[in-house]
């Protein structure tokens, strides 16, 4: 049985080949192996968004935020998906959460 990383790599290859449906299938296979594989959820969210399947993409992106709440990129990604879906207020909300996280990290690191 392939590992989550191997299935993830297969999904990335599908994206590179323009096969987004194949990528979605491979990301889902990776997540069946490891349900907490944040990179798999991230890739799945992006592929789904590119397919216009925004509700599913947002749900996957929310899973990334839950798994990696201190990673600013996860907030940026979900904000981008919401904007692409036409939900600008929700996009701004997620972007603001990401900015607050960044500011907190800067304060923690002693940066002005």
Question: Each PLM stretch: what is its role?
Answer:
Residues 1-4, 80-112:
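Terminal, low-structured helical/coil segments at or just beyond the last alpha-helical repeat
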Residues 3, 16-28, 51-63, 85-97:
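Structural signature of tandem alpha-helical TPR/SEL1-like repeats
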């Amino acid at each position: 049985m392939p590992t989550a990383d191997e299935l993830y790599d297969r999904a990335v290859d599908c994206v590179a080949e323009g096969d987004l449906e194949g990528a979605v299938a491979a990301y889902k296979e990776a997540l069946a192996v490891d349900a907490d594989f944040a990179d798999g959820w991230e890739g799945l969210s992006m592929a789904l968004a590119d397919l216009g399947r925004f509700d599913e993409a947002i749900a996957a992106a929310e899973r990334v935020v839950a798994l990696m709440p201190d990673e600013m990129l996860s907030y940026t990604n979900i904000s981008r998906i919401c904007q692409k879906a036409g939900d600008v207020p929700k996009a701004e909300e997620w972007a603001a959460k990401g900015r607050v996280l960044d500011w907190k990290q800067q304060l923690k690191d002693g940066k002005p």
